[in-house]
């Protein structure tokens, strides 16, 4: 005792408690006792304890410098000495269970006040204030919580060994403790223990163990007892069978004693709860070593042997019949539904408690895992069950306590009516009712399911933990014929929770406080698991989860279902019978609810907590995650309204489900955390995966995350996702009002749907969107779910606002803000503009796998209605579109009509292009691949090195290295490959062609080129000569393409697909070549001044006469194609800036573009890299964007700035405006990309003769897929075609290394980044490592990367289309 007092005195918990209450420990204890009414109680000394002894004990306690000493003295004076002694005298109470005494009545009512209760110490405060104190407090109450079986409840029923004290006259103490236990139960199991829960709980535990609580130790009691025990069984399993047996005995005794003093129902309930809890405590461990199985009398030396014997010989031996044949088993051989239930049940007989508390110094063990879990809450202080009553912050470790609390504290409702004829008792929680029935009416009078149904059945034998669990699972047990058993099962279902109830008691705030108080969800159908709350309850998901975790899954499941039916608290379970009675009173109305409780499928009707209606949806089958978001469930339940609600919530609603899941990414990086969208998307968090580019791309990808969320919104759930975008849109429109959002703008996606139909018309076939999305294809497009319209733009979404999420394409304020651009449905994603057309199968297989950047492609260059479709709409449509396998529709869906037409023509031409690209050289192959890549051949990896690796291992190797390096170096978007962009590293085939599409590739290409340039580039230069012929041919073709391309650009400014035939040199310059061939062919002058950044390598000046001739443009170099761009890549098509046109701004590249734009000639780029500069802003549609094709023959060389280009123009725009000037229809060239990004070509040697700010401008109208679409900043319609650099020509011209030399300038990347809110425009976010100055002039290479990016974008567009 002294030891105990010391521990108590020194108990941080006590200190904390006193501190919490502003009382000295003594005052705390005193006040606590006083509050508990202990002082008002003057029970005789414990039986067998002489007053002298009792006083001696108290004196002993008082003699110690313990707050309890004073309390004891005071209490002794008050005549409560015996009880105080009981409280203060730590005894192995767990070994003593005693009937509750009258004091318990007053205490019981007081007990309703949990430590968390007002009168009691605020355990939450304690816990939150001082975990240590809480832990200490819990440790003190640990045994009680554990012993009491009310996990986390202070009065666990037994004092932990650490707190056990030598018992003066244990017998008398046992009696005293019995009384004490009653008192403690009354007091919340530890009146003093609130100050020092440990003591009380332990005493209680000791009392419990000493005097098995008749009801509390019911697990050993008859089934009726066991029902309580069953609920208690969880704990009861903890409780020794012997104790249970004792409990049985004591239960009856206690029933009498309790019965005798029974105060108001609440007190009685509390008393019963305490008893129950105590019983739950799993009193003294039964240690059976002899087998009493029917016909078996084997004896064993150890319990383990017995258990082994029973399990192997009896249980497993009767595999198909799960019947306990133990002699005198209260179950009366009622079969269990599952073997494990029988196994658990047998623990009642054997006393096995395999689940031991792992906390140091805590020796609690439980037969049921859920009881252990509940118990552990006493250590952790976890109280997942928070009172649902507004303004009440009390939390409970179990649902039953919460239910008690809620019903008792916040209402006078006693829904649990005793169904025993002639009994009018009503209780606030099922455990109390159960306890009442057991104690007052006897173990046979258990409230059964039928009782609850107002059918009083012969109380089935109490379920044990296993039984309870089984019951819980069985809740309406297999043997409905044995109604009592069924009832019992029902109770036991709750009984399972009853153990949980025990557990709930064990919560620090719980047992006495919590247990006394119904768990917060108790109002709801409290199941200890708290699952009760799941459907019916408005409680948090955490409750469900916590409850489930707390209680066995079965319990949680059952209880959750039960909860739906009614609160399943420990009491609920135990009281299931009682609950049947009391709850029936209210639940008679709610018998269905009980059915729900027992029948998971039944929806709870009368849960106190707002039930989450499942639209007939049985939550049971729903994943907890789904359950978490009832809305999602409802959605899955086809509640379109839920969709609307989710949409309304968009961010928060959806996020409930998906935020944690689907929006995990979205919340990750994006400045605005796609969490919003992901929330939206999350709404349907059921989505199997976030198709969002975020998922597809870099997990970090900001933009992807949000969109991915959006995509994910629809991804998992078939309901919305099943809807076609149009359907989704309709739903959206229907619920626009509900969502509070403006009526969904006819989705561009809808338009796209229409478009798709149109495209289908174009294609001649309209492919219905699959009811479910195909596997969500990682896509920016998915991110581009067209819900942006509903969703307010985020700052980052605001055009020109760079703060926008990378995933959110933002119109660049520069040009776009200046002029109203056709509003893309969503700047956040390509799809926002237009629902992404599902990529073609090949695209999905390839591009989709490669996370084709749909985001830009998704942007249809339509003027969209002011309100773009909501994210959900777009997402759903997008997801559907993107995922749907629409033979012709995929591309169509992704692209605007013009784009689709363009793509179609391109696709038709693609073979031609491919053939063209396939002239003879690997470069052609690369081009072909690039083309095919752009031709919606996602299949062709974009990884810059992959294709090269195929053709040029060295290049590929360099590229691969660079890609990896640069992907790492790249901004997330780049890694993510800029929402629309595919990560280059992932794309092996489209090396450079994709480079521009994915700036990442560019970076990779550059870095690769940097290393690659030096050798492979030179080699490429060598090849270049070879390739040049091809290039020339290709250029010819490219010229044709370019012409066609121009047409397409005009037609499909949105689709910037640059394909070019690449010789290996061109490979690294593939994109560049493509761009150069086409862009330059298309309009060398189209190269925006940003292109001026491309430095012509002093050496051969390739001046392509700014003739529209494809060859000239194609060469974009003034020399023969054979003139390689090698060292003299003059790309000064009209787009070239003056030497200092722009300072290359290092993006995330290692390269630092020179602050001054590289001089046209002479200015050597220090980094020897081409770093595309992002255009300062997208040019206004009217802004002169590009040098007219081949207006300025001098490309790189010509130092003259292209005055016609505005600086912004000079700056490559991630999304170049389409220049109507360059409208020369070129043979469809998927490879043809328009790189609007400004590329700063830095000569590896830094020798670029002229710093050319080459803004390879994709046709402004046709930003590379990532560019405009991602950027969403540019209205392609109104934009001029940016000068296109003919990288093929450049490549042909020679210095590939110069082309390749260096990553796109950070500025270019930056412009990309600016332009491309998403990775779609890899250029924006792509940080290209600078290419060593020593590397060959890679201006083209950089252009190539740019072109590659553009190509990728084009490909992406193609994919989207």
Curated annotation (Swiss-Prot):
Instruction: Kindly state which keywords UniProt assigns to this record, in alphabetical order.
Output: DNA-binding, Metal-binding, Nucleus, Repeat, Transcription, Transcription regulation, Zinc, Zinc-finger
- Record carries keyword ATP-binding: no
Gene this protein is translated from: gli4
Q: What does this protein do?
A: Has an essential role in the early embryonic patterning of mesoderm and neuroectoderm.
**What residue spans carry the Low complexity bias annotation?**
506-522, 653-670
Q: Which InterPro entries match?
A: GLI-like (IPR043359), Znf-C2H2_ZIC1-5/GLI1-3-like (IPR056436), Znf_C2H2_sf (IPR036236), Znf_C2H2_type (IPR013087)
Protein name, per record: Zinc finger protein GLI4
Record's compositionally biased regions (Pro residues): 1172-1183
Organism of derivation: Xenopus laevis (African clawed frog)
Q: Where are the zinc fingers (C2H2-type)?
A: 289-314, 322-349, 355-379, 385-410, 416-441
């Amino acid at each position: 005792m002294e030891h105990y007092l010391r521990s108590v005195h020194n108990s941080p918990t006590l200190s904390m408690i006193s501190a919490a209450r502003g009382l000295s420990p003594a005052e705390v204890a005193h006040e606590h006792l006083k509050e508990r009414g202990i002082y008002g109680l003057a029970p005789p000394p414990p039986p067998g304890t002489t007053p002298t002894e009792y006083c001696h004990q108290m004196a002993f306690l008082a003699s110690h410098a313990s707050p309890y000493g004073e309390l004891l003295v005071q209490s002794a004076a008050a005549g409560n000495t015996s009880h105080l002694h009981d409280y203060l005298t730590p005894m192995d109470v767990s070994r003593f269970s005693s009937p509750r005494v009258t004091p318990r009545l007053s205490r019981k009512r007081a007990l309703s006040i949990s430590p968390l209760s007002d009168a009691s110490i605020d355990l939450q405060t304690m816990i939150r204030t001082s975990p240590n104190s809480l832990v200490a407090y819990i440790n003190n109450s640990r045994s009680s919580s554990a012993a009491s079986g009310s996990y986390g409840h202070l009065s666990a029923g037994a004092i932990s060994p650490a707190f056990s004290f030598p018992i003066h006259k244990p017998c008398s103490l046992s009696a005293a403790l019995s009384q004490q236990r009653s008192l403690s139960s009354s007091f919340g199991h530890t009146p003093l223990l609130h100050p020092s829960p440990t003591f009380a709980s332990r005493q209680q535990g000791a009392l419990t163990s000493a005097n098995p609580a008749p009801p509390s130790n019911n697990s050993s009691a008859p089934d009726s007892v066991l029902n309580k025990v069953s609920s208690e069984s969880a704990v009861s399993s903890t409780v020794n069978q012997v104790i249970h047996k004792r409990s049985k005995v004591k239960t009856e005794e206690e029933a009498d004693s309790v019965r005798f003093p029974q105060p108001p129902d609440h007190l009685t309930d509390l008393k019963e709860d305490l008893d129950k809890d105590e019983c739950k405590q799993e009193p003294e461990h039964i240690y059976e070593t002899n087998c009493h199985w029917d016909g078996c009398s084997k004896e064993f030396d150890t319990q383990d042997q017995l258990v082994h014997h029973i399990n192997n010989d009896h249980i497993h031996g009767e595999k198909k019949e799960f019947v306990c044949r133990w002699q005198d088993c209260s179950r009366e051989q009622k079969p269990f539904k599952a073997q494990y239930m029988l196994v658990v049940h047998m623990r009642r007989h054997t006393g096995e408690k395999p689940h031991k508390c792992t906390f140091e110094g805590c020796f609690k063990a439980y037969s049921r895992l859920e009881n252990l879990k509940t118990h552990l809450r006493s250590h952790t202080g976890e109280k997942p069950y928070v009172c649902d009553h507004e303004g009440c912050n009390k939390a409970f470790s179990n649902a039953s306590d919460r239910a008690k609390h809620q019903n008792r504290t916040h209402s006078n409702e006693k829904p649990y009516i005793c169904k025993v004829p002639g009994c009018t008792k009503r209780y606030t929680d099922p455990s109390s009712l159960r306890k009442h029935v057991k104690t007052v009416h006897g173990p046979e009078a258990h409230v059964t399911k039928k009782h609850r149904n107002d059918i009083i059945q012969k109380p089935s034998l109490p379920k044990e933990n296993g039984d309870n669990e089984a019951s819980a699972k069985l809740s309406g047990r297999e043997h409905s014929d044995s109604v009592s058993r069924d009832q019992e099962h029902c109770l036991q279902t709750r009984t399972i929770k009853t153990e949980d109830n025990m557990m709930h008691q064990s919560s620090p705030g719980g047992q006495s406080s919590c247990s006394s108080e119904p768990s917060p969800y108790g109002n709801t159908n409290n199941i200890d698991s708290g699952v009760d709350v799941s459907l019916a309850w408005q409680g948090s998901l955490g409750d469900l989860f916590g409850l489930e975790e707390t209680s066995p899954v079965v319990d949680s499941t059952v209880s959750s279902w039960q909860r739906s039916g009614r609160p399943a608290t420990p009491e609920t379970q135990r009281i299931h019978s009682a609950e049947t009675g009391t709850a029936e009173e209210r639940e008679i109305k709610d018998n269905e609810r009980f059915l729900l409780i027992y029948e998971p499928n039944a929806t709870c009707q009368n849960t106190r907590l707002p039930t989450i209606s499942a639209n007939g949806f049985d939550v049971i089958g729903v994943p907890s995650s789904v359950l978490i978001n009832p809305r999602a469930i409802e959605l899955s339940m086809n509640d379109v309204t839920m969709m609307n609600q989710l949409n309304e919530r968009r961010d928060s609603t959806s996020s409930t489900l998906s935020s944690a899941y689907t929006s995990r990414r979205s919340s990750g990086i994006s400045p605005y955390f796609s969490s919003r969208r992901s929330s939206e998307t999350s709404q349907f968090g059921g989505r199997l995966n976030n198709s969002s580019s975020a998922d597809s791309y870099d997990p970090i990808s900001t933009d992807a995350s949000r969109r991915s969320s959006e995509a994910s919104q629809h991804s998992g759930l078939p309901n919305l996702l099943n809807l076609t975008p149009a359907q989704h849109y309709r739903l959206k429109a229907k619920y626009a009002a509900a969502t509070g959002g403006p009526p969904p703008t006819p989705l561009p996606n809808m338009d796209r749907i229409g478009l798709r139909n149109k495209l289908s018309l174009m294609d001649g076939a309209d492919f219905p969107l699959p009811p479910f999305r195909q596997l969500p294809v990682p896509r920016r497009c998915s991110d581009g779910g067209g819900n942006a319209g509903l969703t307010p733009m985020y700052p980052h979404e605001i055009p020109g606002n760079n703060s926008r999420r990378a995933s959110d394409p933002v119109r660049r304020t520069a040009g776009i803000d200046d002029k109203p651009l056709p509003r893309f449905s969503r700047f956040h994603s390509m799809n926002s503009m237009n629902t992404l057309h599902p990529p073609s199968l090949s695209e999905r297989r390839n591009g989709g796998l490669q996370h084709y950047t749909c985001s830009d492609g998704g942007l249809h260059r339509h003027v969209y209605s002011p309100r773009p479709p909501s994210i959900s709409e777009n997402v759903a449509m997008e997801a559907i579109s993107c995922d749907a396998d629409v033979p012709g529709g995929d591309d169509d869906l992704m692209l605007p009509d013009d784009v689709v037409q363009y793509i179609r023509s391109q696709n038709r031409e693609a073979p031609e292009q491919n053939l063209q690209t396939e002239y003879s050289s690997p470069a052609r192959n690369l081009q072909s691949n690039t083309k095919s890549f752009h031709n919606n051949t996602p299949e062709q990896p974009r990884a810059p090195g992959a294709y090269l690796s195929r053709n040029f291992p060295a290049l590929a190797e360099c590229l691969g290295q660079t890609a990896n390096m640069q992907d790492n170096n790249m901004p997330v978007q780049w890694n993510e490959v800029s929402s629309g962009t595919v990560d280059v590293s992932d794309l092996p085939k489209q090396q450079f062609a994709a480079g521009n599409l994915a700036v990442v590739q560019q970076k990779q290409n550059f870095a690769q080129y940097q290393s690659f340039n030096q050798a492979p580039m030179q080699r490429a230069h060598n090849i270049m000569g070879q390739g040049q012929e091809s290039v020339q041919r290709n250029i010819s073709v490219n010229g044709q393409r370019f012409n066609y391309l121009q047409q397409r650009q005009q037609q499909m400014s949105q689709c910037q697909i640059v394909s070019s035939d690449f010789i290996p040199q061109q490979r690294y310059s593939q994109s560049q070549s493509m761009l150069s061939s086409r862009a330059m062919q298309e309009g060398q002058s189209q190269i925006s001044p940003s292109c001026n950044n491309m430095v012509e390598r002093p050496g051969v000046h390739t001046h392509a006469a700014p003739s529209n001739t494809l060859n000239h443009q194609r060469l974009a170099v003034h020399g023969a194609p054979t003139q390689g761009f090698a060292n003299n890549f003059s790309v000064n098509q009209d787009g070239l800036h003056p030497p200092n046109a722009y300072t290359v701004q290092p993006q995330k590249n290692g390269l630092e573009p020179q602050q001054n734009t590289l001089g046209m000639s002479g200015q050597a780029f220090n980094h020897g890299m081409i770093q595309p500069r992002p255009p300062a802003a997208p040019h206004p549609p009217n802004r002169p964007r590009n040098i007219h094709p081949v207006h300025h023959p001098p490309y790189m060389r010509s130092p003259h700035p292209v005055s016609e280009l505005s600086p912004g123009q000079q700056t490559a725009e991630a999304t170049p405006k389409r220049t109507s000037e360059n409208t020369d229809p070129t043979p469809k060239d998927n490879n043809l990309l328009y790189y609007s990004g400004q590329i700063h070509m830095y000569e590896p040697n830094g020798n670029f003769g002229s710093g050319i700010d080459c803004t390879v401008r994709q046709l402004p109208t046709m930003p590379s897929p990532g560019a405009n679409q991602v950027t969403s900043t540019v209205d392609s319609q109104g934009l001029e075609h940016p000068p296109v650099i003919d990288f093929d020509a450049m490549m042909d011209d020679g210095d590939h290394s110069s082309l390749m030399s260096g990553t796109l300038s950070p500025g270019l990347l930056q412009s990309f980044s600016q332009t491309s809110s998403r990775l779609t425009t890899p250029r924006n976010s792509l940080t290209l490592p600078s290419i060593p100055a020593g590397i060959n002039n890679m201006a083209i290479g950089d252009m190539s990367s740019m072109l590659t990016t553009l190509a990728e974008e084009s490909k992406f567009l193609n994919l989207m289309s």
